[in-house]
Amino acid sequence: MQTEGIQQKYLRKAGLLALITVTGMAPPLSTDMYLPSLPKMADYFGAATVVVNMTMVAFFISMAVGMLVLGPLSDRFGRKITLIVSLLLYMLASVMCAVTASIYFLILMRIVQGIGAGGMVSLSIAIIKDCFEGPTRATALAVVQSMSVIAPIAAPVIGALIIQVSTWRTVFFVLAAIAAACLAATFLFEESIHEDERNEGGIIDSIKRLGVVGRNVNFTSFLLAVSFFSAPFMAYLAVASYVYEDFFGLKPTTFSIFFAINALSSIFGPLIYMRINSRVPAKATMWVLFIIGFAAGISMLLFGHASPVIFLATMIPFSMANSYVRPFSTNILLDQIQGDTGSASALLNFTHTLLGSIGMFIGSLPWSSYVSGIGITIVGFLLLALAVWVYVLKSRWRYMINAR
């Protein structure tokens, strides 16, 4: 890969990709690592499941807000200082989460942590747009997405081991340490956006640049269509521990193995994308993704209650489709934006995160069983995605889609 613009004298290419990858891992690290602890946290705080799950829902909603604020600000003040602020917020909030004795203060600190994570995620995509272009950007996106699978594979396993030898509080201390390491690397990062490329005006003017990107209806329509895939996956994430531990009666360590297998399968999405991206038309790709998704959701509704193995087998195809969508759609969307990269990245990640948060809320509702809830969420959100996709095919963007 060849970087464009300012070279990274200290981080080099490998260090830059490592920093981008780890900061982009903020969502799975911040949720998956303490998934095995959720039942124990509910017992510790004496709180209902829906209240404890608010620690995740609040995180994702505030992360979406952080994206919308910090992403555009990076177009005005630069990537480096904005990333430093994001990491400081995340690190300090993680420490406060670790020492709190109140579930409501924990939710509050998760909000602060989410804002910092929002900046980390949106800036990781913006830096890729700054430093890579053409086929190398497609490869970089796929590499980062593939490497990010390490987080959901390792995080629940690490989390399960932590609660065996310590408590859930240690999980948040670990997150703070990861943020501290990224912060140290960020001080070595050389600014990737030149002074003459930055937006002018104040903070409000910078945030208003979101409207410039958002008013592109064709851009936002395609973004919405692919973002609907995030909702069912996040619904699964929110209740996976309850499905495996409460419904199927597995131990936390066994749950972490099942969870890791599903996460490991997700790595094949970006890998397949790297192999076939230049050979398979985007339009055909989308139709295949829809077929896989609907087949997975319907199979889960029909057979997913039978055993944890069958439930996992119905979830894996959707997880692979969801992991393919991200680099596939991100590369298409970034190609359409000239300037306002931070705003575009923020809007892109915000839409995925907002719909993911909605999916988490819907998945956490008191279904007759969470297995049915996940299956219904998959089918329902894919129907919405299909409706928007049909609109995209009838819009001016059909020429762009057909050309890919």
Language model: regions and residue ranges:
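A late C-terminal transmembrane helix in Major Facilitator Superfamily
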Residues: 332-370, 378
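Cytoplasmic helix-loop-helix junction between adjacent transmembrane helices
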Residues: 103, 109-150
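Helix-breaking motifs and short loop linkers at transmembrane-helix boundaries and internal kinks
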Residues: 44-46, 78, 99-105, 116, ...
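Conserved MFS/SLC helix-loop-helix module at the cytosolic interface between two early adjacent transmembrane helices
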Residues: 64-104
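Juxtamembrane intracellular "pre-TM" segments in multi-pass secondary transporters
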Residues: 2-10, 192-222
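C-terminal transmembrane helical hairpin of 12-TM major facilitator-type secondary transporters
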Residues: 283-329
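Helix-loop-helix hairpin linking two adjacent transmembrane segments in secondary transporters
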Residues: 105, 134, 142-187
